[in-house]
């Protein structure tokens, strides 16, 4: 079975993953990879019209990596991960969603779009 999309980790997302302990990082990456093949909102969920989140619950922590779609390449659909956080509240904090939107805007602006 072919994946539905590829994932690009921007610097802040990669730094977030690098800062996790080995087992947590493996679980987060496993879930991200799994979400490429299955449609499961427990793993990959839409937050707003543009912003999505990769979701992992592991050892009582809730890990979130924010992302958006880049469908400009007709051959490959790309999901771009902006940054991550360990969620401690019931709802995703609005500043995190706003940060993801700003990074998305910069991403497309830097590409000349």
What are these regions (language model features)?
Residues 1-62, 71-79, 85-113:
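Basic, Lys/Arg-enriched alpha-helical interface segments
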């Amino acid at each position: 079975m072919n994946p539905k999309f590829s994932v690009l980790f921007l610097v802040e997302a990669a730094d977030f993953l690098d800062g996790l302990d080995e087992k947590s990082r493996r679980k987060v990456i496993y879930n991200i990879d799994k979400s490429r093949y299955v449609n499961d909102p427990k793993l990959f969920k839409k937050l707003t019209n543009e912003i999505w989140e990769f979701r992992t619950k592991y050892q009582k922590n809730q890990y979130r990596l924010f992302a958006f779609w880049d469908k400009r390449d007709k051959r490959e659909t790309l999901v771009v991960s902006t940054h991550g956080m360990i969620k401690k509240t019931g709802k995703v904090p609005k500043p995190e969603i706003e940060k993801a939107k700003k990074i998305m805007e910069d991403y497309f602006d830097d590409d000349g779009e």
